[in-house]
């Protein structure tokens, strides 16, 4: 239901204001900071860029839906609807305007994010981290001593690992469209497909080897997240890196996802049930930075951008770092304000009784989401 509303409420928000803030002219005010609000979708439909609206809407909804996993099992549905709509209305469109609108200030500086490691995944990951931190952990996640120090972290296994694996396979397949949709030639599309295959594959292998060595067994759920981490990391540089660059990006992503999960659980004590922060936040940052390291003009369609390791100097890396910092700051400030307002007014979290009983009956009036487990007398 939450993922459904991400897209449906996101469509409403993007239609009302978000699309014009992203796609509108930058010349009207603030020098590339925000697009000019307009109702061209309704007033000048015959001349509107319909395909661009749909293309950017899907990206917008993706940023919003990342947050749900980190706040699972204890968030009010009403609160979820509010912040999801605001992400699509204001938070995502403005920073995406900086990155993808020809008049955006980051575009003018030379910042590069082909398909959204920064604009989509990092934004979703940062929002997820802040939301989960303000919401608090699920009941029983952390054991604390008399001084309030966390002494034990409990793992709650997912209810259906094969279904989760199927989701990863579907996402991986869909990512070829996600990354390849903006290709301008067949050669560039082929190169993007190749890097989009190499990075998640190497990420999964590196994660498997690492968890095998560390825990004595390869961690299935961590490897599934590593596949997604590799996809997230390659999303920004998929059109500017070669096979070697994609391989290194993937290997690092597979290790970073393990580190990100550890960071949330044992250092920050933030309860992220699905690893959204590690997958999207940490590897969104890594993918953004990787553009400034591994880009090469030997790749079809990339005639100008060389990274630090390919003779381009430090300037491209500094631009990527600036862009990451600006978008991260914008996202952190705005989503924190949104969450705090919701928390002080309608409330973010369900009651302890509702959480223990489960959100299916308390939020949606369902005995359970899994009818096969119902028994009749």
Residue spans for each PLM region:
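Glycine- and aromatic-enriched membrane alpha-helices
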Residues: 1-377
């Amino acid at each position: 239901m939450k993922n459904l509303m991400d897209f449906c409420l996101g469509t409403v928000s993007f239609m009302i204001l978000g699309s014009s803030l992203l796609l509108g002219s930058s010349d009207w005010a603030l020098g590339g900071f925000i697009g000019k609000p307009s109702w061209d979708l309704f007033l000048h439909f015959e001349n509107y860029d319909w395909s661009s609206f749909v293309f950017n809407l899907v990206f917008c909804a993706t940023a919003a839906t990342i947050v749900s996993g980190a706040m699972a099992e204890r968030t009010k549905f009403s609160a979820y609807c509010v912040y999801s709509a605001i992400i699509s209305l204001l938070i995502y469109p403005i920073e995406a305007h900086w990155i993808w609108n020809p008049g955006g200030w980051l575009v003018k500086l030379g910042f590069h994010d082909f398909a959204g490691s920064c604009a989509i995944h990092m934004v979703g990951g940062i929002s997820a981290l802040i939301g989960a931190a303000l919401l608090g952990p699920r009941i029983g996640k952390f054991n604390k001593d008399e001084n309030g120090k966390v002494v034990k972290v409990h793992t709650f296994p997912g209810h259906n690992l094969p279904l989760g694996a199927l989701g990863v396979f579907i996402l991986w397949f869909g990512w070829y469209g996600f990354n390849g949709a903006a290709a301008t030639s067949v050669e560039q599309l082929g190169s993007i497909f190749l890097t989009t295959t190499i990075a998640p594959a190497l990420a999964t292998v590196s994660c498997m080897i690492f968890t095998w060595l560390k825990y004595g067994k390869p961690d299935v759920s961590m490897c599934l997240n590593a596949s997604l981490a590799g996809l997230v990391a390659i999303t920004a540089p998929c059109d500017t890196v070669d096979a070697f660059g994609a391989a290194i990006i993937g290997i690092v992503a597979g290790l970073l996802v393990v580190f990100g999960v550890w960071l949330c659980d044992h250092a920050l004590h933030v309860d992220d049930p699905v690893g959204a922060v590690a997958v999207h936040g940490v590897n969104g940052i890594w993918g953004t930075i990787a553009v400034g390291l591994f880009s090469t003009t030997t790749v079809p369609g990339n005639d100008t951008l060389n990274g630090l390791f390919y003779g381009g100097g430090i300037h491209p890396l500094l631009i990527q770092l600036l862009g990451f910092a600006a978008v991260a700051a914008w996202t952190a400030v705005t989503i924190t304000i949104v969450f705090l307002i919701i928390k002080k007014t309608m409330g973010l979290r369900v009651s302890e009784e509702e959480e223990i009983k489960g959100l299916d009956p308390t939020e949606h009036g369902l005995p359970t989401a899994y009818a096969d487990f119902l028994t009749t007398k």
